[in-house]
């Protein structure tokens, strides 16, 4: 049975971030994810989780300088010290939040740059991250991003992610499959589920092409959820989509799995 996590970076955005924990719990979610925790002290976030009975299941390493076009620094050859400092900081947050998985962001490869150098830097930094997190039982995620959302990101295909995971070669490295990106880049989602079986550590969902609730568009999510059950996927599924309107009004698709408070 699927386990859904509310993505607090994209859902319940009609209230301030710290109020979204209660909004998610009131809507029936028992777990949450979001992009970046670093604006807030970890103890404050941990208290928000506790007081709302929520589990933190995922967050990302820091994105770098977004205004300058960065989206992660772990693949940037001239930012190795920054990348490892971000990884160390993420570990502190993961421990404080009792979070089982962290997504290490790669980075954008500017046109004309040596992609192989960026890839090797990413591999080296991911080995560093995996080795730092492993003693604590925390998994590291890597995620492919489509050019529609992030042009020139280090890798766009789920099969590139699989190749990188194999090259990194650490037991706590897993692939985070966002079906929004996977459908745009690869398609054939059922085959991806089977080809990556055992290597998928986290999943995210949204409709394609609009990136709204997963009850519209070209992906048959009830079929996808059933297929994930068939391969005994036991991880979380993050709801990383832009609601058509008020988040609560668009959760009808998830009612069979949510634990609404009355």
From Swiss-Prot:
The keyword Chaperone does not apply. Keywords: Carbohydrate metabolism, Isomerase, Magnesium, Metal-binding. The active site is at 143 (proton donor/acceptor), 240 (proton donor/acceptor). Its EC number is 5.3.1.35. One of its GO terms (molecular function) is metal ion binding. Mg(2+) binds at residues 143, 178, 204, 240. Disulfide bonds: none annotated. The keyword Isomerase applies. It comes from the Bacteria. It catalyses: 2-dehydro-L-erythronate = 3-dehydro-L-erythronate; 2-dehydro-D-erythronate = 3-dehydro-D-erythronate. Belongs to the hyi family. OtnI subfamily. PANTHER family: HYDROXYPYRUVATE ISOMERASE-RELATED, ISOMERASE. NCBIfam families: OxoTetrIsom (NF043033). Catalyzes the isomerization of 2-oxo-tetronate to 3-oxo-tetronate. This is 2-oxo-tetronate isomerase. It comes from Pectobacterium atrosepticum (strain SCRI 1043 / ATCC BAA-672) (Erwinia carotovora subsp. atroseptica).
């Amino acid at each position: 049975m699927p386990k859904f996590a509310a993505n607090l970076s994209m859902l319940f955005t009609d209230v301030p971030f710290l109020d979204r924990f209660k909004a998610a719990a009131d809507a029936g979610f028992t777990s949450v994810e979001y992009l970046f925790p670093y604006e807030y002290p970890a103890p404050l976030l941990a208290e928000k989780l506790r007081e709302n009975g929520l589990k933190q299941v995922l967050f990302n390493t820091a994105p770098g300088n977004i205004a300058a076009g960065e989206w992660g620094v772990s693949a940037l050859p001239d930012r190795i010290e920054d990348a490892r400092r971000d990884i160390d900081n993420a570990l502190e947050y993961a421990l404080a939040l009792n979070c089982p998985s962290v997504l290490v962001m790669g980075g954008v490869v500017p046109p004309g740059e040596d992609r192989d150098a960026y890839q090797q830097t990413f591999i080296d930094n991911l080995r560093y991250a995996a080795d730092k997190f492993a003693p604590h039982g925390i998994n590291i995620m890597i995620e492919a991003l489509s050019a529609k959302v992030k042009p020139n990101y280090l890798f766009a295909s789920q099969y590139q992610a699989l190749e990188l995971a194999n090259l990194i070669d650490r037991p706590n490295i897993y692939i985070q499959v966002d079906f929004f990106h996977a459908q745009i880049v690869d398609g054939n989602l059922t085959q991806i589920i089977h080809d990556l079986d055992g290597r998928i550590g986290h999943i995210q969902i949204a409709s394609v092409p609009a990136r709204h609730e997963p009850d519209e568009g070209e992906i048959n999510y009830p079929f996808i959820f059933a297929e994930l059950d068939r391969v005994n996927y036991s991880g979380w599924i993050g709801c990383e989509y832009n609601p058509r309107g008020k988040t609560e009004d668009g959760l009808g698709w998830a009612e069979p799995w949510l634990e609404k408070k009355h």
